[in-house]
Amino acid sequence: KLNNPILIGHSQGCLQILEYAYKYKNKINKAVFIGGSNKMPVHPDLIELAQNGDSEAVKLMMKWGYEGSKKFIGGNPVEKIIKSPRDISEILALDLIACNNYVNGHDAAKSINCPVLFVFGELDKMVNIEAGKKFANLVKDSKTHIIKGCGHMIMIEKAFEMREKVLEFLK
């Protein structure tokens, strides 16, 4: 049994927090949404690429998630995690479909009644700043922090700044 948890999610994980908050009102102590939105539509072509196990799906996501923000020594870490056609078709495709099909985000966000921190990457093309601000405005008790020079993969690109802001909020 969880008693007043603090929930922290990134991207699709934000949708999971939203649904938890909606189903278990008054049970959350605080929440942190990192690079998320109350709705996360996914282009049908990207879903199709992922369903077919095409590595182009991962390349496109990484382009949108990182482009213009940071280059990694040794290559992009996400491409090392999701690398086989099976990973793409059985894991990534299902995640993209779940994001695309989630429709309760607006009502769920409006129902949140605990303090919330929103963290967005200034250069994020997957959840742009405007979508993020609209999301944050749905929540009564919220603070927003935008990390400059950062894309969608905030916890990898700007880990220290993100951690500092989250810890500051949790105190």
Describe these PLM feature segments:
Residues 150-163:
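Catalytic histidine-centered segment of alpha/beta-hydrolase-like enzymes
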Residues 15-59:
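Flexible "cap/lid" loop of the alpha/beta hydrolase fold
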Residues 48-111:
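Conserved alpha/beta-hydrolase catalytic His-Asp/Glu region
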Residues 96, 135, 162, 166, ...:
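Hydrophobic "lid"/C-terminal helical patch
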Residues 129, 133-152:
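Catalytic histidine neighborhood in serine/cysteine hydrolases
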Residues 2-11:
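Alpha/beta-hydrolase fold nucleophile elbow
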Residues 87, 127-130, 157:
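Residue-level signal for the nucleotide or nucleotide-sugar donor/cofactor binding architecture
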Residues 112, 118-120, 124:
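Short beta-strand/loop motif that positions the catalytic acidic residue
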